[in-house]
């Protein structure tokens, strides 16, 4: 291992080690809030647990807050195909009002086996968070053939897949530090890559898509902006 590789590995370990502990929804766990220690370390909450404040709704999916979580209900039926088009499902997004460049981020999510969702970072096209050329999409789809949960669509596929996230509350830990991108799911690193394409943009969350529509919920969405030397 070269000295440069050692420095990169050490920086990644330091960043991941600074993620806040898991809030398990028990009494006194302060769901959707940053603790005093987290605030001193620079963490802020992107979701207040009560409203959609700080988020813009895009597309044809209804988002609500249920039991302290951002919730998108699955569509009851797909969109009927027209002409040569294929059958698709209604798709919608939440997009953060603020942009972020370099950061650590955590988010808990609940998905089903048929859920088609994703967590988007550095969305350079604010009107279209689903644009694969304008966002890094951290996929949420355990059975996806090429990019299961924790992979970045078009960048990295975590195969063979070794983490089951569906049917329970799971957690993303994300590092975006310059070109260095790290994604953990429930504490296990599934993506650790370098990619130069996108440097800044909004955070996005997806519900529904071309291949299916299942329930998705998000909570405890926290971010810590990083300063690069």
Name what the model sees in each region.
Residues 11-21:
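Hydrophobic h-region of N-terminal signal peptides that target proteins for export
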């Amino acid at each position: 291992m070269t000295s440069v590789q050692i420095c990169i590995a050490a920086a990644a370990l330091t960043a991941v080690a600074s993620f806040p502990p898991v809030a398990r929804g028990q009494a006194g766990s302060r769901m959707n809030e940053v603790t005093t220690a987290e605030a001193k370390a620079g963490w802020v909450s992107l979701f207040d647990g009560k409203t959609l404040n700080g988020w813009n709704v895009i597309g044809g999916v209804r988002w609500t807050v249920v039991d302290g979580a951002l919730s998108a209900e699955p569509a009851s039926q797909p969109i009927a195909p027209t002409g040569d088009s294929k059958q698709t499902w209604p798709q919608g997004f939440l997009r953060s009002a603020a942009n972020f460049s370099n950061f650590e981020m955590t988010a808990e999510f609940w998905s089903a086996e048929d859920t088609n969702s994703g967590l988007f970072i550095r969305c350079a096209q604010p009107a279209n968070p689903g644009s694969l050329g304008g966002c890094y999409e951290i996929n949420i789809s355990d059975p996806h053939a090429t990019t299961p949960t924790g992979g970045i669509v078009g960048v990295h596929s975590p195969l063979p897949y070794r983490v089951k996230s569906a049917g329970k509350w799971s957690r993303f830990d994300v590092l975006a530090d310059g070109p260095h991108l790290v994604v953990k799911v429930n504490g296990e690193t599934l993506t650790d890559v370098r990619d130069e394409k996108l440097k800044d943009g909004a955070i996005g969350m997806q519900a529904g898509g071309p291949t299916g529509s299942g329930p998705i919920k998000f909570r405890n969405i926290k971010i810590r902006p990083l300063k690069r030397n």
